[in-house]
């Protein structure tokens, strides 16, 4: 596998993931099929797992950050890493080659517009459901995943907090049924029944791995490619599952830019066994990108 930015280039560059640690070229390259899930404190790319994440639900609390993933991924071995820049580039390259666009959402939107949070309307005991208005319930996708929690007097509904998950964490929506002329119930496959109050909330969560396994072929989403609620796969790799994906081999260093504002230098690690959270080590041993991320006030900084 090679790529080139010129039609006349005679010596194409090998894809980085095809280069072995000793510098030789492998006859194949491997990309993880799924986002990592956690099994007994160890990350695995396996079917049927909630994506590893750092929310404070008892079932989660995984160290998913650039720094945290160094130790977390190395539990599998010194050359393991979270998603790399080359994993991401491969997906982008496949979109360019197969669909002739860099605007991936025009072809497959992924789970990018599915962030519902609704308050339960009816107190119940020993159930596996919440009751919402019919319009609210219609916004949920059967087969997708949600958490249910009693927030009490808390007003912050961020999924990070444990109280957003204290009734049921990342459980599947099994059915949606009308309960009267105005309301409908969203049922879940919680491990045990729970009580609901008027401070119980339901919130969407990322899809579990394997959500695209029933999609015929190598590309596409199960229900809709463009509804913004379904993850998709490209070249067999599942992606856009409804969560931020942290790159495990790239770090941004905050520096003073040419205009005096805080710009970002981008450093890329090309050997997972040398990953470091020490910025001096990063500057000395990582490869510095030519491009610098310019300052933008009060906004996310993207590479």
Residue ranges of predicted features:
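Assembly/oligomerization scaffold segments
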Residues: 1-5
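Short, conserved beta-strand/loop elements in beta-sheet-dominated catalytic cores
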Residues: 79-88, 213-303
């Amino acid at each position: 596998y090679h790529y080139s930015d010129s039609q006349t280039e005679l010596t194409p560059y090998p894809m980085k993931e095809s280069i072995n640690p000793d510098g030789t070229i492998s006859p194949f390259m491997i990309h993880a099929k799924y986002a990592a899930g956690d099994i007994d404190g160890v990350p695995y790319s396996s079917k049927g797992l909630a994506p590893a994440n750092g929310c404070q639900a008892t079932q989660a609390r995984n160290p998913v950050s650039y720094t945290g993933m160094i130790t977390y991924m190395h539990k599998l071995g010194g050359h393991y890493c979270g998603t790399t820049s080359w994993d991401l580039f491969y997906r982008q390259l496949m979109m360019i080659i197969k669909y002739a666009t860099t605007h991936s959402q025009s072809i497959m939107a992924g789970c990018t517009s599915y962030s519902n949070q609704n308050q339960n309307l009816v107190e119940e005991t020993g159930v596996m459901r919440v009751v919402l208005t019919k319009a609210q319930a219609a916004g949920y996708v059967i087969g997708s995943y949600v958490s249910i929690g009693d927030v009490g007097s808390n007003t912050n509904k961020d999924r990070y907090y444990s109280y957003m998950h204290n009734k049921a964490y990342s459980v599947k929506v099994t059915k949606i049924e009308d309960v009267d002329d105005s309301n409908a119930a969203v049922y879940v496959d919680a491990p045990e029944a729970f009580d609901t109050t008027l401070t119980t909330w339901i919130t969407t969560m990322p899809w579990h791995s394997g959500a695209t396994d029933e999609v015929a072929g190598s590309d596409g989403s199960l229900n809709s490619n463009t509804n913004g609620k379904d993850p998709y796969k490209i070249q067999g790799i599942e992606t856009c599952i409804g969560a931020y994906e942290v790159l495990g081999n790239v770090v941004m260093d905050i520096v003073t830019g040419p205009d005096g504002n805080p710009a970002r230098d981008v450093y890329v690690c090309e050997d997972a066994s040398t990953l470091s959270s020490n910025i001096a080590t990063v500057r000395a041993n990582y490869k510095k990108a030519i491009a610098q991320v310019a300052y933008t006030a009060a906004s996310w900084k993207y590479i």
